[in-house]
Design a protein with these regions (language model features):
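A ligand-binding cleft/hinge motif common to bilobed small-molecule-binding domains
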Residues: 77-80, 208-209, 213-231
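Periplasmic-binding protein-like
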Residues: 120, 184-189, 197, 228-252
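Paired acidic/hydrophobic, glycine-rich loop segments that form the ligand-binding mouth/hinge
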Residues: 68-72, 196, 213-218, 234
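Mature extracytoplasmic/periplasmic domains
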Residues: 242, 251-309
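Extracytoplasmic ligand-binding site segments that recognize negatively charged/polar headgroups
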Residues: 25-31, 67-68, 72-208
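Extracellular/periplasmic bilobal clamshell ligand-binding domains
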Residues: 293-334
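Early extracytoplasmic/lumenal segment of secretory-pathway proteins
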Residues: 15-80
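Short beta-strand->loop
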Residues: 88-97, 114, 142, 230-242, ...
Length: 334
């Protein structure tokens, strides 16, 4: 894991430090629109510890939370951290901007824990140049004309478990209650799957090289695919896209709990949410952010769309994670 320390203001005198564990991407834009403005407003120095979800959470667990004040995590890893007792309880009185964000983002894991600062969705991308028959439904992934033409995220990725849920629906069962039936549907789907992927860049490359005609993806991948393949289109399936969120939480034992809550509130503000949306870094959850059609392109934006999402029960997924991974590998590891 790479640890990056920034003193964005370049000052020589000592300042309070706020240590944030986050991803490494879009660092320059986050520095410009969030880190530097926050440092200036509160007279602090932000120190970043970067890496992927799994590596950062594992490091936090091994250190029992020491050395980090705030942590950004995707949904399933947020649930893991809660179960491990790694978060402080949030004082919502310090998050006055909560009243301005969509209900789905306010307390996705309960009132004691941090809100979502962005919302994403899992849908389908397909190449109109290769497919004359449009894709409109999750069930279309099983079509005969898609043999060896699609890619889906691996089970261990953020969006991976939604493939199991989709397979359950295809067989008209609850994947949580009847996983054998759901994985039976995945066996049927395997003939259509050229390969599974772990990184969004891999999916974009497969589209660009004409290897696949369709893929299941998070919406943030679409701009990259569209740039490489202008004939690609995004589909929110008629059954609804799956919601995914990223959260910010204060780490258990942090000496800077109140400052951390100020940071979370800052990120939820209308100005910051709009700046980040316009920079195409994250989709906004603040309801006061107004974007035109071009500005909203590639983002998950608007109450109507967000209200149409299918929820994902990460608690139930985490209970079944080992079993699901094992069943998945039996199908796709061969």
């Amino acid at each position: 894991m790479l640890v990056v320390c920034f003193s964005f203001q370049g000052t020589l005198f000592s300042k309070d430090k706020l240590v944030i564990s986050t991803w490494g991407y879009n660092g320059d834009l986050l520095k410009k629109y969030i880190y530097e403005p926050f440092e200036k407003k509160y007279g602090v120095e932000i120190v970043l510890e970067t890496g992927n979800n799994a590596a950062r959470l594992n490091k936090l667990k091994l250190r029992k939370g020491k050395g980090v004040d705030l942590i950004y995590l995707a949904s399933s890893y947020t649930m893991d951290a809660i179960e491990l007792g790694l978060f402080e309880k949030i004082n919502r009185a310090n998050l006055i901007n909560l009243s301005e964000i969509y209900p789905v983002a306010r307390s996705p894991f309960g009132e004691d824990y941090g809100p979502a600062y962005t919302v994403m969705r899992v849908g389908i991308i397909y190449d109109t140049a290769q497919l004359s028959n449009p894709i409109n439904s999750w069930n279309d992934l099983w079509r005969n004309d898609l043999r060896n033409k699609i890619s889906v995220p691996n089970i261990t990725t953020t969006a991976g478990p939604t493939i199991v849920m989709t397979a359950g629906r295809y067989k008209k069962v609850d994947a949580f209650m009847q996983s054998a039936t759901a994985f039976g549907a995945l066996k049927d789907l395997k003939q259509n799957i050229l390969k599974t992927y772990n990184r969004s860049s891999d999916l974009a490359n497969m589209f660009a090289q004409g290897e696949i005609a369709a893929g299941v993806a998070m919406n943030f991948v679409m701009p990259r695919v569209k740039k490489a393949l202008p004939s690609a289109v995004w589909v929110d399936p008629q059954e609804g896209s799956f919601v995914n969120i990223n959260t910010i939480n204060v780490v258990k034992g942090s000496p800077n709990k109140e400052l951390g809550e100020k940071y979370i509130n800052f990120v939820l503000s209308e100005k910051i949410q709009k700046d980040i949306a316009l920079a195409k870094v994250d989709s906004p959850v603040n309801v006061n952010v107004i974007l035109n059609q071009k500005q909203a392109e590639g983002l998950t934006y608007g109450g109507e769309l967000i209200g149409s999402f299918q929820d994902v029960n990460w608690g139930e997924i985490n209970k079944r994670k080992k079993n699901w991974i094992s069943q998945w590998n039996e199908i796709f590891a061969n």
